[in-house]
């Protein structure tokens, strides 16, 4: 039994390596950082978007062979336009940050960058997953019972 | 992308300006400002989560090891283990319920009820789940086909599809239909033009004789889901090889398969990301795709690797899945091993593992 308990603790410690937010935890963090209604985008929109982009995994990374860019973090923000990873051709870095900043457990910088993205004319439509899963849907379930 | 709509409406308001220079400057600034998607998640959308009226062939196909864009399908293990029940193991759901569900699956896989899973049993299960994904695709295809065949004559032409595709990209459906009817050049951006070209190639490939560019419902299914059509699977393989093949010899070397973009990585974390990506692809290349281990992947090898109904692949996959969780190395899976490695099988940790097992004893 002791061995199993030790195993359990090891599992717990292993899970700390990659910060994966719980849905409501994420919603509260967003609200605390002024995301509710930012540029007309509701909290539920942001939660829905992040679930479909990264399943709330702060260290999600996906490479895009097409333009040799990479999408980083809980919002899957792209290195071609928004951040610098030192290896993306024709990069712009509109958020003025290294892409590694988007992978941190503390998602403050990722939120600031997401705000910058949504201030562009296309707004939240910059996120394909939002268009395909969240647009014109009833999103109340994404923040249900979160107290936000 | 929808940003074209914004440009169109903005262009109208700019037409009133007298100075052409200002109009051009505005256009250039607008193009630069609006053509910046947050990411390219399009290529990674799960097929199971597609909208009902989805008419664009997905890059991601459930139960297929490589995406259409050459990425490894990181959800493959869960897809062939869970079948269409992939959404039942959300992080939010209670651990006890997830555990019970996992044990129900275990008892189904364990055909001879000896309380452990053999490679043969897992292989059989994988084949069953893969077929399940295909049945799901057939069902979805009826809806998609109905969306592109509104007159219900059982055929959809390339021109009809093009109208629907561009409408789904935010273009005005009537304007597009008129332009096509009058053989006018379509005003679409470069990226959409390229996608259309690829789609047209696939359309040609899916169009069985007679070559009339009209697709039936079955042909449309192979257009959206090439993995279960021999001809379309070959086409898919050819596309992937073409994308990755740098020296043009129509096969893939290890460097080609794992190639990363040139450039200096800025820090150690970036280097770690690259290393992980390369390591995963190298392992897949050497251990699985290159079946004769000669350092070269031919189109035939890649096709065998991607064929979801290949029995040899399913057995290999079964052995691989068992090996990952088989702690006592008896080449079988016991209930406690599956529970401990639940994240590998379901994509979701069972955080109360220790407590649950304690209660079981």
Swiss-Prot record, chain A:
InterPro entries: Glyco_hydro_22 (IPR001916), Glyco_hydro_22_CS (IPR019799), Glyco_hydro_22_lys (IPR000974), Lysozyme-like_dom_sf (IPR023346). It is an enzyme of class 3 (hydrolase). Its EC number is 3.2.1.17. It catalyses: Hydrolysis of (1->4)-beta-linkages between N-acetylmuramic acid and N-acetyl-D-glucosamine residues in a peptidoglycan and between N-acetyl-D-glucosamine residues in chitodextrins. Residues 1-18 form the signal peptide. Keywords: Antimicrobial, Bacteriolytic enzyme, Disulfide bond, Glycosidase, Hydrolase, Milk protein, Secreted, Signal. Expressed in lung, small intestine and spleen. The lineage of its organism: Eukaryota, Metazoa, Chordata, Craniata, Vertebrata. Monomer. GO terms for biological process: defense response to bacterium; defense response to Gram-negative bacterium; defense response to Gram-positive bacterium; killing of cells of another organism. Lysozyme C is capable of both hydrolysis and transglycosylation; it also shows a slight esterase activity. It acts rapidly on both peptide-substituted and unsubstituted peptidoglycan, and slowly on chitin oligosaccharides. SMART domains: LYZ1. The active site is at 53, 71. Belongs to the glycosyl hydrolase 22 family. Pfam families: Lys (PF00062). The keyword Glycosyltransferase does not apply. GO terms for molecular function: hydrolase activity, acting on glycosyl bonds; identical protein binding; lysozyme activity. Residues 19-148 form the C-type lysozyme domain. It is found in: Secreted. This is Lysozyme C-1. PANTHER family: LYSOZYME C (PTHR11407:SF28). Disulfide bonds join 24-146, 48-134, 83-99, 95-113. Its main location: secreted. Lysozymes have primarily a bacteriolytic function; those in tissues and body fluids are associated with the monocyte-macrophage system and enhance the activity of immunoagents. In the intestine they may also have a digestive function. GO terms for cellular component: endoplasmic reticulum lumen; extracellular space; Golgi cis cisterna; Golgi stack; microvillus; rough endoplasmic reticulum lumen; secretory granule; trans-Golgi network transport vesicle.
From Swiss-Prot, chain B:
Induction: Down-regulated by ethanol. Down-regulated during the progression of cerebellum differentiation. Keywords: Calcium, Exocytosis, Glycoprotein, Golgi apparatus, Metal-binding, Phosphoprotein, Repeat, Signal. Glycans are attached at residue 39. One of its GO terms (cellular component) is cytoplasm. The modification Phosphothreonine is found at residues 192, 216, 264, 298. Ca(2+) 6 binds at residues 326, 328, 330, 332, 337. The keyword Ligase does not apply. Ca(2+) 4 binds at residues 245, 247, 249, 251, 256. The keyword DNA-binding does not apply. Residues 97-132, 136-171, 196-231, 232-267, 277-312, 313-348 form the EF-hand domain. It is found in: Golgi apparatus lumen. One of its GO terms (biological process) is response to ethanol. One of its GO terms (molecular function) is calcium ion binding. Ca(2+) 3 binds at residues 212, 219. Residues 1-35 form the signal peptide. It comes from the Eukaryota. Ca(2+) 1 binds at residues 110, 112, 114, 116, 121. A membrane-associated isoform may be involved in the exocytosis of zymogens by pancreatic acini. May regulate calcium-dependent activities in the endoplasmic reticulum lumen or post-ER compartment. Binds calcium via its EF-hands. A membrane-associated isoform interacts with STX3 and STXBP1. Belongs to the CREC family. This is 45 kDa calcium-binding protein. It comes from Rattus norvegicus.
